[in-house]
UniProtKB/Swiss-Prot annotation:
Main location: membrane
Source organism per UniProt: Caenorhabditis briggsae
Protein task: Has a role in mobility, possibly in the transport of potassium in muscles.
Cross-referenced SUPFAM superfamilies: Voltage-gated potassium channels
Record flagged with keyword Transferase: no
A GO term, aspect molecular function: outward rectifier potassium channel activity
Region forming the signal peptide: none
Name of the protein described by the UniProt record: Uncoordinated protein 58
Keywords: Ion channel, Ion transport, Membrane, Transmembrane, Transmembrane helix, Transport
Residues that span the membrane, as ranges: 186-206, 291-311, 320-340, 402-422, 430-450, 455-475
Superkingdom of the organism of origin: Eukaryota
């Protein structure tokens, strides 16, 4: 609420208003004199016009301050400067009082709000409740709090300005600073690329020989088939030439076809080539990859963002449908997995807490039996139970597991799944089944498995959904550690203050930082509570004219009591002794920050 005077003697309905005092307009006198000098123009303009030179001379010499280097506030019959007293027939609150405009032109300012906040040269923040003008408004806990746009913003701007006022760093120092900030990120990306290259090189060494041997065996079989077919054809031709046998065209075609079918079966051993070649024009005789099990596995891999090499969509309509299906289904899948994972994590937390309490009670019981001090240990045990359940500070304690525990949990689930898969796929080894299950739950891929049994298909779907929930549970429990590690790496070499915070949190952090610097140590909740209770809450209403109507004990006479208010104001501003007495009654406000 800005200070303005509605009662101004003027031809128009104009009102005098006072803007925010900038740092260059401060007086070189005491703190109280500075505040009183701010109220002088308002009181004078309230009771008489600014055109009265006699009244203007009533201002003491040491309370005058300069608008610029050559012009005083009032000199003779001159008009008051626009920078301090502005005539305006518009609303009593104008842009001249905007704290944003004032903040662009000054670093420190005297904010005449309720309560009055001022920042001294040494950085102290003074909150004054006596000289603040309230216009008859009652003070409550809400109105007495700092205005976020004025009080705390000034603190934040002061901190930022102090940081900007530091000496600029040289070019090598700036280079070292940016290198320090970029170094952990470059190292992280380099480690990731190196890890990928290392994995590719190791897999290349492990799988190259096996892949070459498998392909060589296949080519050997094809070579043998071609050699046998050539030998058989030559034998049949020789026998026909020598008259040993007679061969017609149909017999030769059947023999040649048989050898070609064998070659095709060797190249593609996953399709019933022989049956399909018998009736190639009959579509019902063809092998269909898009069965319900394979289609279900495909859409499952679409929602879990892992691949399936057995089938893929080829039509344009199918591709559009797959995209639309994934846009709706992927969030649904992960929300469901997260919900189940949260339930599993809460269940695990309750189980571990119950286990810890049970073990603790057993140990206490064994200790009581062993030492025979039941009563004392029972009382101590009852207190410990409360502390263990709620934590030391009365909050629910967090369950902490090392990172290896979450990895072990995932591996245990994959082992259970591999034991299930082995019962359905007799040709699979434990390692093969474990790898298959792990690829499913970490959304690597389903491979090119062909499922024909519906029970086995149902087990795979359930394994994938529950597996994603288990992974989500592990990530949820390990999020605290992962977030701490990520924060350390991401903000290495730079300050974490104000990053990712809202504007309100920035103001609070700035206020606490100022309190910590003034206190010289850690700011506790008691410090904040004392500051709020002592300065901003439970403050009685004090009229803004309290100091003007105040009488000293040596001035209480029948004559003084009948002096009119206006003449008393003249005496008030004429006598510097009165100002000295007022200053003696109101010592400097303590700096709570």
């Amino acid at each position: 609420m800005f200070f303005y005077s509605p009662n101004v003697a003027s031809s128009s309905s104009a009102s005098h208003r006072r803007g925010t005092l900038t740092h260059q307009h401060h007086l070189h006198v005491g703190h109280l004199d500075t505040r009183l000098s701010v109220q002088i123009p308002e009181i004078l303009s309230r009771n008489f016009g600014h055109h009265d030179p006699e009244r203007a001379r009533l201002v003491p010499e040491h309370l005058r301050f300069l608008v610029d280097e050559n012009q005083e506030l009032w000199t003779g019959g001159n008009q008051p400067p626009v920078g301090i007293l502005e005539l305006c027939a518009a609303s009593p609150v104008d842009s001249v009082f905007s704290t944003n405009d004032a903040r662009r032109h000054s670093q420190r300012k005297l904010i005449l709000r309720r309560p009055t906040i001022s920042i001294q040269e040494d950085g102290k923040i003074i909150i004054d409740h006596v000289t603040a003008r309230w216009e008859g408004a009652n003070i409550n806990s809400q109105s007495a709090l700092l205005d976020a746009d004025d009080g705390a913003t000034v603190i934040t701007d002061t901190i930022k300005d102090d940081q900007e006022d530091k000496e600029p760093k040289s070019c090598p120092q700036q280079t070292v600073k940016y290198i320090k900030i970029l170094l952990p990120h470059v190292i992280l990306v380099s480690v990731l690329i190196g890890y990928l290259c290392l994995g590719a090189w190791i897999l290349m060494l492990l799988e190259t020989r096996t892949e070459l041997l498998s392909r060589s065996k296949k080519l050997v079989r094809l070579t043998n088939l071609m050699s046998n077919f050539t030998a058989e054809s030559w034998r049949m031709l020789s026998d026909a030439q020598h008259g040993s046998i007679t061969m017609d065209e149909g017999e030769w075609a059947a023999t040649f076809r048989e050898w070609m079918v064998r070659v095709s079966e060797t190249v593609d051993d996953r399709r019933p080539i022989r049956r399909e070649l018998n009736r190639p024009d009959d579509l019902s005789n063809m092998h269909n990859k898009w069965t319900f099990p394979t289609a279900l596995l495909y859409v499952l891999t679409v929602l879990t963002t892992c691949g399936y090499g057995e089938v893929s969509v080829d039509t344009d309509v199918g591709k559009v449908f797959s995209v639309a299906f994934a846009l709706v289904g992927i969030p649904l899948m992960f929300i469901t997995a997260a919900d189940i994972g949260k339930f599993l994590s809460e269940t695990l937390l309750k189980f571990v807490s119950f286990w810890n309490r049970s073990v603790r009670k057993v140990k206490q019981w064994m200790s009581r039996v062993r030492h025979g001090r039941r009563k004392s240990l029972q009382s101590t045990g009852g207190q410990n139970d409360t502390l263990d359940i709620l934590g030391v500070d009365g909050t629910e304690e967090k369950l902490w597991f090392p990172i290896g525990a979450y990895v072990s949990c995932i591996c245990l689930y994959c082992s259970m799944g591999s034991a299930m898969f082995i019962n359905w796929e007799r040709t699979w080894s434990f390692i093969h089944a474990f790898h298959f299950g792990f690829n499913l739950i970490v959304t690597v891929g389903l491979g090119d498995i062909v499922v024909t049994d519906y029970i086995f298909l149902s087990l795979i779907v359930a394994f994938v959904i529950v597996g994603l929930s288990v992974v989500t549970m592990c990530v949820d429990l390990a999020s605290t550690h992962l977030k701490a590690y990520f924060t350390r790496i991401h903000y290495f070499g730079r300050a974490k203050r104000f990053l990712g915070m809202s504007e309100e949190l920035k103001e609070i952090v700035a206020l606490l930082g100022a309190m910590r610097r003034k206190k010289g140590g850690k700011v506790t909740w008691n410090d904040v509570r004392d500051f709020l209770d002592n300065e901003l809450r439970d403050r009685p209403f004090e009229p803004h004219e309290l100091l003007m109507k105040l009488r000293f004990i040596d001035e209480t006479s029948s004559g003084m009591s009948t002096i009119r208010h206006n003449s008393f104001q003249s005496d008030f501003f004429r006598e510097s002794e009165y100002i000295r007495r007022v200053a003696a009654l109101r010592p400097e406000q303590p700096a709570y920050l």
